[in-house]
């Protein structure tokens, strides 16, 4: 398997890294941005659009760049490296991906073109209270009256739901899960935003006879498309976690070299360097799994199973690296003024977005029905 990047991909990484590095040069700069609404920097979002980043995975005919999952993964990793709060995965990979997969020509042109230009931010309203990352809807229903559709019910939490200009909403219609587009200023739509512990934003979204437009044509069940879109987003979040874990590890290694105890740097204590080495092993195991999963997405293979494997390994590595980064720093690691705690907080949030490690392990274990399934020689 070839995990190397070509010149264009390396150029993309350098450009995105430079932009986000300037926007979030220090942790104080990020704290100022996430302290106010909408929780990310609109100017940085616009600059990403100018670079073509927001249209990367979409077809050129829809206003995009026609790139693939590898390019998307590069952007996600650089976002994680500096904890940039811009909703790239939520808006581009998840909500935008569903519109690209299922939308009519007119819907794709309207939503994806504006998203690529940076003038529209979509969000996927799917999670419901009491559910655990299922691809089906239950609490929101869609009813048709005279050719018009209206939604009733509650979605919570909806990442970036309070800021979104348009919502892609899953709802029950005719006994199956379907998808609808709802404008941010629609009648009967109430959104209550809140700040998450990692500084990102989510919202409670209530529909009270809210006008909606079916996404795409046909009346079939869309839960399969939802599951595939969620899997792609899990892989992208895996790359965001890789960027965050790498920064946490690098920061910890630098601290061990600079901080002195008993007159010598902490890096001279073998027990501490062994712990840092174990962090590196966890990072590289996660990196290999997530990069492999990205190639599965690129080849349109079994995306769901690959995403579960990537999520499990990323979950384990995130917990290990986040915990050790704080432990090896000592008390300063949990202060708001120092960045390591913020990286651990974001890694914890990613671990619970769209399914945590225990959930992924249970799904993988449920797919094992015979010894041959796990026998590499079979």
Write out the residue ranges for each language-model feature.
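Alpha-helical interface subdomain recognition
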Residues: 1-83, 102-105, 118, 148, ...
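Flexible, small-/acidic-enriched active-site or ligand-binding loops
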Residues: 133, 137, 157-158, 183-218
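A structural signal for short hydrophobic beta-strand segments in well-ordered beta-sheet cores
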Residues: 140-142
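Short loop-to-beta-strand entry elements in the cores of soluble alpha/beta enzymes
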Residues: 90-99, 238-240
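Short, flexible active-site-proximal loops enriched in glycine and acidic residues
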Residues: 82-91
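A short core secondary-structure module
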Residues: 125, 152-189
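Short glycine/proline-enriched turns and hinge-like loops at secondary-structure junctions
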Residues: 67-68, 134-136, 160-164
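A short, Trp-centered hydrophobic/proline-enriched beta-strand micro-motif
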Residues: 118-129
């Amino acid at each position: 398997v070839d995990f190397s990047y070509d010149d264009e991909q390396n150029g993309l990484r350098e450009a995105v890294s430079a932009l986000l590095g300037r926007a979030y040069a220090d942790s104080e700069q990020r704290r100022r941005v996430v302290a106010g609404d909408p929780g990310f920097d609109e100017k940085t979002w616009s600059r990403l659009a100018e670079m073509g980043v927001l249209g990367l995975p979409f077809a050129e005919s829809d206003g995009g760049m026609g790139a693939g999952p590898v390019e998307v993964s590069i952007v996600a990793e650089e976002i994680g490296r500096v904890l940039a709060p811009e909703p790239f995965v939520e808006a581009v990979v998840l909500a935008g991906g569903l519109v690209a997969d299922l939308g009519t020509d007119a819907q794709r042109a309207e939503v994806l073109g504006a998203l690529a230009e940076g003038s529209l931010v979509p969000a996927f309203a799917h999670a419901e209270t009491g559910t655990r990352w299922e691809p089906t809807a239950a609490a929101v229903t869609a009813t048709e009256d005279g050719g018009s559709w209206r939604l009733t019910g509650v979605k919570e939490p909806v990442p970036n739901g309070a800021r979104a200009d348009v919502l892609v909403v899953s709802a029950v219609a005719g006994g199956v899960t379907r998808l609808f587009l709802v404008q941010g200023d629609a009648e009967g739509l109430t959104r209550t935003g809140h700040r998450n512990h990692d500084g990102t934003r989510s919202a409670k979204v209530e529909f009270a006879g809210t006008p909606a437009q079916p996404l795409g044509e046909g009346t079939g069940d869309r839960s399969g498309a939802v599951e595939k879109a969620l899997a792609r987003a899990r892989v992208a979040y895996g790359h965001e976690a890789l960027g965050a874990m790498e920064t946490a590890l690098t920061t910890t290694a630098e601290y061990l070299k600079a901080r002195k105890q008993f007159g010598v740097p902490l890096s001279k204590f073998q027990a501490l360097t062994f712990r840092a080495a174990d962090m590196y092993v966890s990072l590289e195991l996660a990196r290999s799994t997530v990069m492999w999963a990205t190639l599965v997405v690129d080849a349109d293979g079994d995306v769901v199973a690959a995403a579960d494997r990537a999520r499990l390994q990323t979950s384990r590595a995130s917990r290990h690296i986040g915990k050790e980064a704080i432990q090896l720093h000592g008390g300063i690691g949990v202060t708001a003024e120092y960045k390591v705690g913020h990286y651990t907080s974001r890694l914890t949030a990613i671990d619970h977005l769209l399914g945590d490690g225990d959930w992924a392990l249970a799904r993988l274990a449920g797919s094992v029905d015979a010894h041959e399934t796990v026998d590499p020689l079979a």
